[in-house]
């Protein structure tokens, strides 16, 4: 059976109600989660296409199934657009997620038990950069590096010192909650000084890299992994890039048959759409506005007594705030703001003292609100509303005012 919208609603009203509720939530909430964005109708159309019916194990021209002529075209379009977008010689667009892209990259680069340097979770790293609860920390011997305790910036001299002490086979650069520029050339120097490979996870900053708003890691890294959503504004998925032909072959084998079976060609089609959108000059304008909006919010937060900008501000699409001095932890701040139609997430900060389920801070991103049409004026208003709620977290009258203002703002910028 093929359902249209009305048939779907009548066939499965419970599921339809949940989807509709999420649509309303997205319409009414100011979305500040840094890893989220709002995709185009074209991206959604591609992901919801008949390609979801097709199995296509293998790669274009080398499939284990017949009838793959059309999906070969789809996947090749995604590959060629990704290569053009990031200046890469090779691209694998099959990873189902950023985590699976990282898993395959590790498989291609190192062996189980090898020593790896990765950014500490509290400093802004990702679970797949060596967290003990993650496959990465269980499979490989990860040694963490952090940030300077005073500046909260990456300390490249300290990273070099750690690298010389532990002699890693691989160094992982990139983060999920680091608000400043990353110097990939320095990471390359450090890796070369100890004979290590360099892998860059640019999941959060891919959209910035694509437009030149952040240095491109491709000239320096052996392998680059990324997600295709976040600032790239595509479907949820992953990708691996390299300029090394031998590594490209290992990466392809690590994805299939190493860690995945059939690729999700409907998602790959949506990736191809997103890459084409990102190649358009309008996307550069969008990313420029994302950065302007982030900095506008940072300026407002800097005025609020009791709030502290981690690392002193932002060079990219996100910023981190310490909220604990306001008498509220990160989890409480997240829940409080959700109640007034503002969505963000709790976030650990450098030298964190609370558990990951509480945290001392929150993370804020501007990608989604910028996709919605917000500019600096609205971004400043958003920061003011967040601050008003956090400062007055026990004042129901003030919170009601914030809730009303947030709803009014989202009404002005419908999805």
UniProtKB/Swiss-Prot annotation:
This protein's GO CC annotations: cytosol
This protein's name: Serine hydroxymethyltransferase
Keyword Coiled coil found: no
Database matches in InterPro entries: PyrdxlP-dep_Trfase (IPR015424), PyrdxlP-dep_Trfase_major (IPR015421), PyrdxlP-dep_Trfase_small (IPR015422), Ser_HO-MeTrfase (IPR001085), Ser_HO-MeTrfase-like (IPR049943), Ser_HO-MeTrfase_PLP_BS (IPR019798), SHMT-like_dom (IPR039429)
Chain positions of site Plays an important role in substrate specificity: 229
EC class of the enzyme, as a word: transferase
Protein family per UniProt: Belongs to the SHMT family.
Keyword tags: Amino-acid biosynthesis, Cytoplasm, One-carbon metabolism, Pyridoxal phosphate, Transferase
Coiled coil: none
Catalytic reaction equation(s): (6R)-5,10-methylene-5,6,7,8-tetrahydrofolate + glycine + H2O = (6S)-5,6,7,8-tetrahydrofolate + L-serine
Pathway(s) this gene product operates in, as recorded in its UniProt entry: One-carbon metabolism; tetrahydrofolate interconversion; Amino-acid biosynthesis; glycine biosynthesis; glycine from L-serine: step 1/1
Source organism phylogeny: Bacteria, Bacillati, Bacillota, Bacilli, Lactobacillales
Predominant location category: cytoplasm
Top-rank lineage group of the source organism: Bacteria
Cofactor: pyridoxal 5'-phosphate
Designated gene of the protein: glyA
Residue list for modification N6-(pyridoxal phosphate)lysine: 230
Species this chain originates from: Lactococcus lactis subsp. lactis (strain IL1403) (Streptococcus lactis)
Pfam family, one: SHMT
Subcellular localization, as worded in the UniProt entry: Cytoplasm
EC number in record: 2.1.2.1
